[in-house]
From Swiss-Prot:
Entries under InterPro entries matching the protein: DnaJ_domain, DnaJ_domain_CS, J_dom_sf
Gene Ontology molecular function terms on file: unfolded protein binding
Disulfide bonds listed in the record: none
Protein name: J protein JJJ2
Span of domain J: 11-79
Gene name, Swiss-Prot/TrEMBL: JJJ2
Subcellular location, principal: cytoplasm
Residues bearing PTM Phosphoserine: S229
Length: 583
């Protein structure tokens, strides 16, 4: 029987084919397409409808991935009212359907296949078509950790086959199993087997009565135990394992408490698990009468030579001891380091030192209290009259300084001086004497601290630094007035006919120009000296703009000098021409 996938798709819209709504994104469309394509591909499934559905999925994916076709299709869905259509819930659920395989034998039933698996190798049929293909559900469910004894296995099958030949009974396994492989053995709530007519016939053939479920499960040679279903065998194996674990835990607990308990209790505890593993004598008697030839010597599960030899050990055997030791070592490896200060115990010497110091402090406190009680701050003078009044006179009281107080300074005012300066109770305070009292007080001026001088020096230094970075224009040789000086104009020599007057005018013009030249040269020389003096300061970043203004002043000064030179050249040229013409 093979399994075939029967797909179901909602083919109302292209979105519903892919199991999506109209709001799905392109990535969701692509993911749904890949998922359905893997399931509906003709090479992957043997269903007749898979090819047609696969083509529909591919067509829907091609339309929804194309933007133009998707817009047109969405417009058509809105017109038809299917834009908000939700795919059906019962679709996109792939059901598996059982299908008969052509190669399998139709005559072979499940009971026969199950019966074949339970037979030993030498009794199994061989050839083609005698068995079924092993699947995950039909595999043996016997746990892999179950112990296997070859001799007992062969002996059990030998005895069972011998008894079948003796009684001539049919195959018992076929009677105990239905077509679906489930066991017909039914257990009641009380733990006994359901004794119907069919089972009575079976037990009459075998020559036995129905026993309790516990005796059949414990007896390895029982024919009923071999006929139980796999599910019941698993339950029995699990119960046996739980019982063994509980018995091992009890045995380990008895070993741990062997030192503290008495010898009688140790013997009693060691005997208890053995009693539990034994079967009642009535059941043993019935088993011996029915199956004397099938009985095997029972071995106690707790017979261990190592444990019997060493009863004082808390472990059942060396495996438990090895497990406990390895677990302890692993736990110590991953344990965090503990601070060594916490592990150091408090020494007695340190405690004694603290105790001595505490005793000294207590003695000092007691002595201070006694002194305060004995020495009163105010002592009353003795009065001769016995019938003295209870009123206290301030004049007769003497003030004594207590022992615990520090010595007062010379400048401090004592209580006696304060008593003399204060007015009496009946005397009124006169405001006229305030001026005299204020004048009598000597007021001393506090000297200035060194910190104030240091702060003043820092401020002065800062101001000097600012002056260095911003020098005055006069120090740099800049005189803006020289730029305002007018250059003398060229005189009109055409109106002068006399040569002597011409010479006088030329000399006057030349003298004015020379004076102006002299002042310009003096200013330029002063500027040159200032540049050499403040060269370090001018090359700093904050003084670049100042240096630029200085150079602009020098340029304007040189322009003025050039204009003056040109005018002098023109006057000399005119004077030379007039002299040549007169001659």
């Amino acid at each position: 029987m093979s399994q075939v996938i029967e797909p179901q798709l909602d083919r109302t819209t292209y979105y519903s084919i892919l199991g999506l709504t109209s709001n799905a994104t392109s990535s969701e469309v692509h993911k749904s397409y890949l998922k359905l394509a893997r399931l509906l591909h003709p090479d992957k499934t043997k269903s007749d409808k898979s090819e047609e559905l696969f083509k529909a999925v591919v067509h829907a994916h091609s339309i929804l991935t194309d933007e133009d076709q998707k817009l047109r299709y969405d417009r058509d869905l809105k017109i038809k009212g299917l834009h908000t259509y939700q795919p059906k819930k019962n679709c996109h659920i792939f059901k598996t359907k059982a299908k008969e395989s052509q190669g399998a034998s139709p005559t072979l039933g499940q009971s026969e296949a199950y019966h074949r698996q339970n037979k030993p190798y030498e009794q199994q049929p061989y050839g083609f078509g005698v068995g079924k293909k092993m699947t995950s559900s039909s595999k043996s469910k016997v746990p892999i950790f179950k112990s296997f004894n070859l001799k007992s296995y062969q002996r059990n099958h030998y005895y069972s086959s011998k008894k079948e030949r003796k009684h001539g009974s049919p195959d018992i396994d076929s009677l105990f199993h239905e077509t679906n492989g489930a066991s017909k053995v039914r257990m009641t709530d009380a733990g006994k087997m359901d004794t119907n007519s069919q089972f009575q016939e079976i037990w009459e053939i075998l020559g036995k009565n129905a026993y309790t479920h516990k005796s059949y499960s414990e007896d390895p040679n029982s024919c009923l135990g071999s006929a139980l279903s796999d599910h019941e065998e698993e339950e029995e194996a699990g119960k046996q394992q739980q019982q063994q674990q509980q018995q091992q835990q009890q045995q380990q607990h008895y070993g741990m408490t062997s030192k503290s308990s008495s010898p009688d209790e140790e013997k009693k505890n060691n005997k208890e698990p053995k009693r539990e593993s034994r079967v009642s004598p009535e059941e043993n008697g019935e088993e011996e009468t029915g199956h004397k030839q099938f009985k095997l010597p029972k071995t106690s599960t707790f017979s261990s030579g190592s444990h019997d030899s060493n009863l004082q050990s808390p472990f059942y055997n060396h495996e438990y001891r090895h497990y406990a030791r390895s677990k302890f070592e692993c736990k110590n490896q991953f344990r965090k380091s503990v601070s060594p200060i916490k592990e150091i115990p408090a020494t007695t010497s340190a405690n004694e030192g603290w105790n001595i110091l505490r005793d000294i402090i207590e003695k000092l406190n007691i002595s201070n209290v006694d002194d305060r009680n004995k020495d009163l701050l105010f002592r009353r003078d003795e009065i001769g009259d016995k019938n003295h009044s209870d009123s206290i006179d301030i004049e007769n009281l003497s003030i004594k300084e207590p022992k615990g107080m520090k010595r007062r300074k010379k400048d401090d005012i004592s209580l006696e001086e304060l008593f003399q300066s204060l007015p009496r109770e009946k005397d009124y305070f006169m405001m006229d004497a305030i001026n005299d009292s204020l004048e009598s007080i000597n007021l001393f001026k506090k000297p200035k601290t060194t910190q104030s001088h240091e702060q003043g020096g820092t401020f002065a230094q800062a101001e000097s630094n600012r002056a260095k970075f911003k020098p005055l224009l006069e120090q740099c040789g800049i005189t803006p007035e020289i730029l305002d000086l007018e250059i003398p104009e060229i005189p009109e020599f055409d109106a002068v006919a006399d040569l002597e007057t011409l010479k006088l005018n030329v000399q006057l013009f030349n003298n004015q120009c020379n004076k102006l030249k002299e002042t310009i040269h003096q200013v330029s020389l002063q500027r040159l000296r200032a540049d050499t003096q403040f060269s370090d300061m001018l090359t700093q970043k904050q003084s670049i703009m100042v240096w630029k203004t200085y150079l602009e002043f020098d340029k304007s000064l040189m322009d003025k000098l050039n204009i003056l030179q040109e005018r002098q050249m023109q006057v000399i040229k005119i004077f030379s021409e007039r002299c040549d013409g007169k001659v």
